[in-house]
Amino acid sequence: VLTFGFTLLTSDIAIGRRTQKSAIGAYAEMKPKWKFLGILTFLVPVLIMTYYAVIGGWITKYAVVYLTGQAKAAAADDYFTSFITSSTSPVIFALIFMGVTAFIVYNGVQDGIEKVSKWMMPVLLVLVVIISIYSLTLKHTDSSGQVHTGIQGFLYYLTPNLEGLTVQRFLQILLDAMSQLFFSLSVSMGIMITYGSYVKPDVDLNKAVNQIEIFDTGVAFLAGAMIIPAA
């Protein structure tokens, strides 16, 4: 995040601000022969959307379930399995999710994405904080009778385990971290180039990128604190 992430994110936003265009147009303006790079970066979010639509459909389904007062039914062990194995329900909710997403994107960055994000992101952040705190209060007893608490899970989450670390495993961890970096910061996907085209010339890019990285890392940490202690 502090090295590759900062450099790549700054580059993407700077390209967008300089050219005032989306990925395909930006690369073409810098050099016509580079237009294919813009096309490749455009294809990345298209591919990502293929499974985002599925996961978004799951979230939409559970949102409807909870809003209609069926939370207890959704907590059953076989509820999720029966939903995803249905021949119609996952498709319907994925289409609903895609329809809402398409409507927001159709309205553009400022009138669509920005307006929705201004209220959606704070709500999601508050929910993540609440669930993270709740995860710390959980505890369960395993088959041997030993009690495991959320605090123990949180400490496990924070404690590095260097046992059995080899060069090969270290390189794999590094590769995984790089993959997470590209995905989390949305670099080299054309997304930040498009956002960069809306950045005003007087904005300090170094400061803006630092803020993005701090917020991104903070949310990632909270996501881990939300999931791992509960596991």
Question: Language model features by range: what are they?
Answer:
Residues S11, G56, V109, G190-I191:
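Hydrophobic/aromatic residues in alpha-helical transmembrane segments
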Residues S11-K21, D202:
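Membrane-interface helix-loop junction between the first two transmembrane segments
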Residues K118-A231:
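Membrane-embedded translocation segments of transport machinery
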Residues L2-F6, L40-K61, V123-L136, F215-M226:
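Hydrophobic alpha-helical membrane-insertion segments
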Residues V1-S11, L37, S89-P90:
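Extracellular loop-to-transmembrane helix junctions
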Residues G5, G16-R18, I48-V54, L181-S188:
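Short helix-coil transition sites and intra-membrane helix breaks within transmembrane domains
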Residues K21-L40, A53-G112, K139-L175:
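Inter-helical loop and helix-membrane interface segments of multi-pass membrane transporters/permeases
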